[in-house]
């Protein structure tokens, strides 16, 4: 289902629980983090688009993915600036920048300014918050 940023997805907690696996719910709706090197996409090499598992919004292109050595899928740029929103995260005694899907407000991960990429950014994303659609 394709939606625009101006057409946000709203659902009840029960709706999300019925749509998502327990791990996907914990990460996307409760702000959890999967263990490094355990997610389906940390070492994924497919050619296509990574979408939000909750609403299907296009978030990251595979040609913007790189191996950061962290054990999570890492991208140096989102599909467009409006697809991902950022908020300050002060949990766990740290100050970080959380990234969320702009359409459904699902937690994706965090963005850091520490990568040797064209933007200098590393979008560190939980695999459980993503669905991959092959280009073919």
From Swiss-Prot:
NCBIfam families in UniProt: peptide-methionine (R)-S-oxide reductase MsrB (TIGR00357)
MF term (GO), any: zinc ion binding
Catalytic class of the enzyme: oxidoreductase
Record: active site: 124 (nucleophile)
UniProt GO BP: protein repair; response to oxidative stress
Its EC number(s): 1.8.4.12
Disulfide partners: none
Keyword DNA repair: no
Family, as annotated: Belongs to the MsrB Met sulfoxide reductase family.
SUPFAM superfamilies linked to this entry: Mss4-like
InterPro entries to which the protein is assigned, alphabetical: Met_Sox_Rdtase_MsrB, Met_Sox_Rdtase_MsrB_dom, Mss4-like_sf
Keyword annotations from UniProtKB, A to Z: Metal-binding, Oxidoreductase, Zinc
Every MsrB domain range: 13-135
PROSITE patterns named among the record's database cross-references: MSRB (PS51790)
A cellular-component GO term for this protein: cytoplasm
Protein name from the UniProt record: Peptide methionine sulfoxide reductase MsrB
Short name of one Pfam family: SelR
Species per Swiss-Prot/TrEMBL record: Synechococcus sp. (strain RCC307)
Cofactor(s) this protein requires: Zn(2+)
Reactions accelerated catalytically: L-methionyl-[protein] + [thioredoxin]-disulfide + H2O = L-methionyl-(R)-S-oxide-[protein] + [thioredoxin]-dithiol
Cofactor note: Binds 1 zinc ion per subunit. The zinc ion is important for the structural integrity of the protein.
Gene3D superfamilies reported for this sequence: Peptide methionine sulfoxide reductase (2.170.150.20)
Domain of life: Bacteria
Binding locations of Zn(2+): 52, 55, 101, 104
């Amino acid at each position: 289902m394709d939606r625009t940023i101006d057409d946000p997805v709203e659902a009840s907690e029960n709706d999300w629980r019925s749509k998502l696996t327990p791990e996907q719910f914990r990460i996307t709706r409760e702000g959890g983090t999967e263990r490094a090197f355990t997610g389906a996409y940390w070492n994924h090499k497919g050619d296509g688009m990574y979408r939000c598992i909750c609403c299907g919004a296009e978030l990251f292109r595979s040609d913007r993915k790189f191996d950061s050595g962290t054990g999570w899928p890492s991208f140096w740029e989102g599909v467009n600036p409006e697809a991902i929103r950022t908020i300050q995260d002060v949990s766990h005694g740290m100050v970080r920048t959380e990234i969320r899907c702009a359409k459904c407000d699902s937690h994706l991960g965090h963005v850091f300014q520490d990568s040797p990429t064209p933007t200098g950014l590393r979008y560190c994303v939980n695999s459980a918050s993503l669905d991959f659609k092959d280009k073919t």
